[in-house]
Amino acid sequence: MAKKLRVGILFGGRSGEHEVSLLSAASVLKAIDRKKFDVVPIGITKQGHWLAPGDAHSLLAGDTSAVARRLRAGDPEATPGAKLLHEGIPTLMVPEPANGESAAKAALSPASPAMLDVVFPVLHGTFGEDGTIQGLFELAGIPYVGSGVLGSSAGMDKDVMKRLFAQAGLPIVKHVTILRSEWEKSPKKAIAQIEKVLKYPVFVKPANLGSSVGISKAHDRKTLGPALDEAAKYDRKLVIEQGVGGELRKGKLGPKARELEVAVLGNDDPKASVVGEIIPGKEFYDYEAKYLSEGSVPIIPAKLTRAESKQIREMAVAAFRACDLAGLARVDFLMEPSGKRRIYINEVNTLPGFTQISMYPKLWEATGVPYTELITRLIEFALERDCEKKRNSYSRDDK
């Protein structure tokens, strides 16, 4: 019988998406194939402390739909794993690549004398999917699920991401990028710069954040200022995008853009899932609509023509390659609600949610890849990518 791989599951983190990460980790720990993998859950507190919980099963306590209700009520202990992050054993990852071994491993100290064979970072947002923790894995010489340092950082920064999309010939909405310092120094000048390029409504976003945290929709100059202030709480760089549909006319909102999503899986030969659609329960698919509201409705597969579906799936793979991604990504699109029904690529998410209501696993399940198999494939792609990296020479003396 083949020896089981020891998989480190990282969750939590210094991020506005900390709670979402705990929910995702609970789902992954419940579904991972225990016949193939030994699991070491590793929590990261909001302050950045690494903890190795003693009892992984505690992470699964509670039903995630109940968790969502408790989160809405502001319960700080609502999420699975919250208790573990108070009771875990302080730990760290030793950046010491293995020498002469068939597989790179990383040690956890002092929580476990054993080595990890691979890491699955179930981390969302800053310090989780922005390339920082991926750099630590590279230093430690350990295989990990997901994109590398470059792809992760590019996939996190909406400004850089859009530049890569444009260079690859992918259609994007008009946008303006300003710095927080520019907005604070000269608000009138910043607003004039935005209004020169874009028409209302516009979406204002922190450049480096996910799960729609800090995003607002502005219908006019009066609402633009507060939207910029909100985004500026989270990042030094602000991205303002042209809205697609949803114009405010005579006090009424026009038809909204269709919000479409595709899950991509693989390394050098990535595959795209069926196309899904989200019907938000609110004006747009914000943080509350994604994780706390029961009003949003996923439609899988989306109601599209065969040609539209083919185009969107091809664009998803092209975006994956343009950002040099690996392992997994969810690619989001906007489609005009009427007229020419033009399709725009919105963004990529390099570590999409794995909660019970997350689209990434749902899209693959609809494509024929069950959740447990999906996790196994992601770990296999991490090992495949590590083998490919081992072919690289890092000095002239390497043999």
Locate each region found by the language model:
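ATP-binding N-terminal substructure of ATP-dependent carboxylate-amine bond-forming enzymes
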Residues: 1-150, 154-156, 160, 167, ...
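ATP-dependent carboxylate activation and anion-phosphoryl transfer catalytic cores
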Residues: 2-5, 11-15, 34, 169, ...
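Solvent-exposed alpha-helix faces
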Residues: 26-27, 229, 317
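A glycine- and small-aliphatic-rich helix-loop capping segment at beta-alpha/alpha-beta transitions
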Residues: 135-144, 220, 225, 366-367
